[in-house]
Amino acid sequence: MKKKIHPRYSKITATCSCGNIIEIFSTINHNINLDICAKCHPFYTGKQRVIDTGGRVERFKKRFKFTKQELN
């Protein structure tokens, strides 16, 4: 195998805007700032909400309503 062809891995810190600090190994040589992480993302925190704009979901269900007979 050839030597000195692989990138160097170094330990960096990824800092989220919520204050969470994550230490990871990466090929980049500087620390990074994140806008969102698993600690503050709505999907992971359970604060996710579904927004139905103007009853569009209901209109879709009504428009494409199939009976069991039509599916067979």
Swiss-Prot record:
NCBIfam families: L31 (TIGR00105), PRK00019.1 (NF000612). The keyword Nucleotide-binding does not apply. This is Large ribosomal subunit protein bL31. Part of the 50S ribosomal subunit. Binds 1 zinc ion per subunit. The keyword Ribonucleoprotein applies. It comes from the Bacteria. Keywords: Metal-binding, Ribonucleoprotein, Ribosomal protein, RNA-binding, rRNA-binding, Zinc. Zn(2+) binds at residues 16, 18, 37, 40. Its cofactor is Zn(2+). GO terms for cellular component: ribonucleoprotein complex; ribosome. It comes from Buchnera aphidicola subsp. Acyrthosiphon pisum (strain Tuc7). GO terms for molecular function: metal ion binding; rRNA binding; structural constituent of ribosome. Belongs to the bacterial ribosomal protein bL31 family. Type A subfamily.
